[in-house]
Amino acid sequence: MLHSPKFGTTLANRVLCPPYIKLLAKWAMSLKKTLKASEQGREDIAKNREEWQKFQAKVDAHRLVFLDESGLKTNMTRLYGRARGGERCLDSAPCGHWETVTILSSIRFDGSTESLVFEGAVDRKMFDAYIKEVLAPTLCPGDIVVMDNLSAHKSQKAYDEIRKRQAEVLFLPAYSPDFNPIEKMWSKVKQVLRGIKARTEEELFAATGTALDTITSSDAQGWLDSCGYTTFKS
């Protein structure tokens, strides 16, 4: 039973009736993730997203270089497991002390990445260093570097380094991570890292390299496709 002074008493731990579950299976319905930013419904945001979709329909996906950052920790572990009926599935991970690092990376249509792992959060100085020393040397004339409008990304020095390579910079519409396929790359990278369970910064650095090595051109093309970049199919 679940009790509340405000809402009274209700039954708890009730299980969905089997006929309902069977009906969902019959209709081939499965659990989906549908959450998106409510701000996407704002008129100005919606207009910018519509313009971006027009851009998607005509841009050569081979030219796109997507950029983003993410956090990695030394307490990562698998979130779910399997065990025989009646037995627990147990695991362990640090709960009080762990290390956190940041990874800045790009991804292209062919699955290639240019990545930098470092301590602390992304700031203008670190972003400039990444662009100059890691990303810019790999750019080709006509490339388009796509990133979100994070304050650390607003660097004229970084833009100049990119334009020296005859490439250009484009910012994604606000509240639109669904237009950046690198978000899906992070999901795969972290899935691999949860399996490796690196517990020191040195181990995490090596494990991150291993995770990035699992990314294939097929992965990248699938991620671009799911985000609306389909010109490579024509």
Model-derived features: where do they sit?
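Short functional hotspots at interaction and active-site rims
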Residues: 1-234
